[in-house]
Every structure is written in structure tokens, then in C-alpha cells.
């Protein structure tokens, strides 16, 4: 990604629609490489013994500070990125890419976002190798999984082009 992007206000609803399958049992994640987006989801996965290769968090839940997730990440390599609400900053995109590269070399990595991590679901779908699973939280619904494949990437890229403008 070459530019910082801003979410178009009239596309916010479309971007927040469920993009995968609601997780009824964490067993579906067995033997999968996981990239998690969100503090609660990451904490739930770690608490159940499923360690995401990459975790993207902002140390908040429902916009309230909650630093407890950080205590689960003691053996993760930590990267920090700025990503204000309603944006997709190039810096954050590149940190997600770096975290994936680190994980492919055998070390788990976390991106701690100064701002908001929600929209980093886009690089979490577009950047990992096929076969990974991106897991995120859908408020009022639960955890959602997106299998990373060509179709998921194309849908994410199309929505990215439709819903964002360079800033």
C-alpha cells in the first residue's frame, strides 16, 4: 500500500458487515496459522491455548482502555504502529506485513496500534499466505474467521478500493 487511506463515511456500514464465518467452536482453528485482529479475540485465543502467529491489538475493548491482553504476549515480538480511527495508515500496513514476515521465520509477532486496529483486518486478509485464517471480533455476534485465499483477497481489495480514499 502506497498511501494513507481514509474510510468514506457512507461506506462504514458496508465495511463492518460480517466477512467470514461465525466461529461456533475454536476446534475449527486446529492446526491453522492464525492472524487475530482485536484485543478480546486475541485474549480468547491465547487463553484457549491457540496462539496466533500474528496478533493486531490496540489495548482497548469497545473504545475503553484494557491493557490485559499485553500480559499474554510475553514471548511475542512487539511492533508498534500509528493508525487513527477511520484510517488505514501505510505505517500500520507495513507493520502488519513485517509481523507476518517475522512469524514466517518462526517467531510470533504482535502489532500494538496507537489508535484503532479494526480496519487492519484489510492487510490481515490481503498479506498472509494462502491457508492462514484471520480471526476478528464482531460486536454482539462473537468471533468470525476468514480463510485466506484468492477469493478473500479479491473481495478485500475490491472493498478497499470502493470504501477508502487517499489522504
Curated annotation (Swiss-Prot):
GTP binds at residues 39, 41, 58, 60, 117. Keywords: Coenzyme A biosynthesis, GTP-binding, Kinase, Nucleotide-binding, Transferase. The lineage of its organism: Archaea, Thermoproteota, Candidatus Korarchaeia, Candidatus Korarchaeales, Candidatus Korarchaeaceae. The keyword Mitochondrion does not apply. It comes from the Archaea. Pathway: Cofactor biosynthesis; coenzyme A biosynthesis. This is GTP-dependent dephospho-CoA kinase. It catalyses: 3'-dephospho-CoA + GTP = GDP + CoA + H(+). The keyword Signal does not apply. HAMAP family: Dephospho_CoA_kinase_GTP_dep. Belongs to the GTP-dependent DPCK family.
Amino acid at each position: 500500500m502506497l498511501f494513507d487511506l481514509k474510510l468514506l463515511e457512507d461506506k462504514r456500514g458496508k465495511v463492518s458487515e460480517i466477512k467470514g464465518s461465525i466461529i461456533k467452536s475454536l476446534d475449527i482453528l486446529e492446526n491453522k496459522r492464525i492472524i487475530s485482529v482485536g484485543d478480546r479475540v486475541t485474549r480468547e485465543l491465547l487463553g484457549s491455548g491457540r496462539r496466533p502467529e500474528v496478533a493486531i491489538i490496540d489495548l482497548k475493548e469497545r473504545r475503553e482502555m484494557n491493557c490485559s491482553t499485553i500480559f499474554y504476549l510475553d514471548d511475542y515480538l512487539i511492533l508498534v504502529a500509528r493508525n487513527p480511527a477511520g484510517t488505514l495508515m501505510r505505517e500500520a500496513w507495513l507493520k502488519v506485513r513485517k509481523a507476518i514476515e517475522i512469524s514466517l521465520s518462526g517467531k510470533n509477532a504482535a502489532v500494538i496500534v496507537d489508535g484503532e486496529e479494526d480496519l487492519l483486518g484489510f492487510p490481515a486478509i490481503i498479506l498472509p499466505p494462502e491457508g492462514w485464517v484471520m480471526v476478528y471480533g464482531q460486536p454482539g455476534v462473537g468471533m468470525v474467521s476468514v480463510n485466506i485465499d484468492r477469493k478473500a483477497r479479491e473481495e478485500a481489495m475490491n472493498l478497499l478500493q470502493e470504501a477508502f480514499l487517499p489522504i
